[in-house]
Amino acid sequence: MALLQISEPGESPAPHQRRLAVGIDLGTTNSLVAAVRSSVPEVLPDEQGRPLLPSVVRYLPAGGAQIGYKAQVEAVRDPKNTIVSVKRFMGRGLKDVAHIENTPYDFVDAPGMVQLKTVAGVKSPVEVSAEILATLRQRAEDTLGDDLVGAVITVPAYFDDAQRQATKDAARLAGLNVLRLLNEPTAAAIAYGLDNAAEGVYAVYDLGGGTFDISVLKLTKGVFEVMSTGGDSALGGDDFDQRIACWIVEQAGLQPLSAEDMRLLLNKARAAKEWLSGADSTEVDAVLSTGETVHLVLTAETFAELTANLVQKTLAPVRRALRDAGVAVDEIQGVVLVGGATRMPVIRRAVAQLFGRAPLTNLDPDQVVAIGAAMQASLLAGNRAAGDDWLLLDVIPLSLGVETMGGLVEKIIPRNSTIPVARAQEFTTFKDGQTAMAIHVLQGERELAGDCRSLARFELRGIPPMVAGAARIRVTYQVDADGLLSVSARETVSGVEASIAVKPSYGLGDDDIARMLQEGFQSAEEDMRRRALAEERVEGERLLEALSHALDADGDLLSADERAAVDAQVAALRVTLQGEDHRAIKDAVDALSHGTDEFAARRMDRGIRAALAGKRIEELG
């Protein structure tokens, strides 16, 4: 999700007053920090000149932690206390973690986000990520020679509210002021679009260590519009490592394996994968803790066979994103590759074959996201320079709505809406004297609440008692620049108000997102039939409720025969409401409504006479 930049906060009036802000690519495998210096964005290296920081944290028995290369070296020897690829766990519950059986960790199935047992105690993914972010913050401050005013941190476009909030929490824990969360493909678009002065429709194919994103972007005269997004936040280079590791286990007959040996084989698998990016074959040699030895030859051809379905798994969201954008493959003017995993020849061949053109690779795929984030951070800090006259528009991937009577969904913000965005809609009460309203916030493309994802519930109380339909409750949905949702409800007469910030306890898996979209497309006709049925039932129940109150108050206005006729129509409607034919229900509602027109007119006459009783004509003037 999410960035709409219209105007910038106070700009620095002079170069010597420039405020220091950085862009951080918090990656699954590696993380980077970059800054704009002398109008040039650059990745900030460590003391040894290394731009990448392995996203690895090892907790020590005596307290403290090793971060980066030092931790990576110890990963095989101390796998349970060395956390790698923590990004996969951000905002996730235990059931959402992919390949959990192949991880060496002791998980704690805590409410909400998964936690990990270490020698230093139970750690959350937020705490682990904060260690990485704090290291990058210190690197930046040491390099730039001053404190930072803030950072733009990149996240996968398909990160949901829980994952985004977890990222912001980690940044705050690391002492960073978050200027903005920025989609990784969007960050790449900033870097490529500005560097190359490109215009037209582009695709950004971003395959990192643990996440995959695809974005379709329209670049026109400095305006970056994200037309659609897609992806899988549990698919990345790590999955290719897993395939190789499983192949090694199968070829060498190595079951069962200790956590230490599994980590060793994953490291060997990663090394083999990287070697095959520039060679036709590689040797895999390992000595396990049991003394067993492994010697295998992995060819590029075998690797392609092992990972073919993973490659295809990235192409399905690409096709879906193109459909959502209303763009044909031949309209794409260029494909930008982002993420170290895109160095794999199997990926580059598949992308070239799908789009019918070689992808763009003139920027380092490991660094392009951090560079784009640094450029955005510099602008948000107020460091505008000549030529920084560009606009960025981004979108949300799934519709946001509210449940109405009958279990229906009223969409407030449709999917692919540009954000930040605020939309409001008025609703009313269903019953006479209703003083409270339950607000059920939903996400998804289906017509009925039961088929959508529940995000939050809250109540608006203190509504003044009125007849049904008289109260006006204004419900406002607001998605901020980081893609986080807040919902408020306000009764317009009394001013009573309630609100909630939506923070799901754990994230929505991307298989679920894809399934929700697919079901929405496939079930559209049936959903509309069910919606029509629910709407007619609600209308029927509303009419019966109103008529019941009217008969209690003014039933004496009807003769015995008239009352019998109305009762017969009421009974007929009640029977019809139990059926599944929405047209029959509508006919029964219309019949009862027309059958009580005369009764309604008599009630109105009685009400007018009561209101005028005892008043003089001049008082009415």
Swiss-Prot record:
GO biological process entries: iron-sulfur cluster assembly
PROSITE patterns membership: HSP70_1, HSP70_2, HSP70_3
Molecular functions per Gene Ontology: ATP binding; ATP hydrolysis activity; ATP-dependent protein folding chaperone; unfolded protein binding
UniProt keyword Glycoprotein, yes or no: no
Domain of life: Bacteria
Pfam families linked to this entry: HSP70
Keywords: ATP-binding, Chaperone, Nucleotide-binding
Ribonucleoprotein in keyword set: no
InterPro entries attached to this UniProt entry: ATPase_NBD (IPR043129), Heat_shock_70_CS (IPR018181), HSP70_C_sf (IPR029048), HSP70_peptide-bd_sf (IPR029047), Hsp_70_fam (IPR013126), ISC_FeS_clus_asmbl_HscA (IPR010236)
Family label: Belongs to the heat shock protein 70 family.
Function: Chaperone involved in the maturation of iron-sulfur cluster-containing proteins. Has a low intrinsic ATPase activity which is markedly stimulated by HscB.
Protein name as catalogued: Chaperone protein HscA homolog
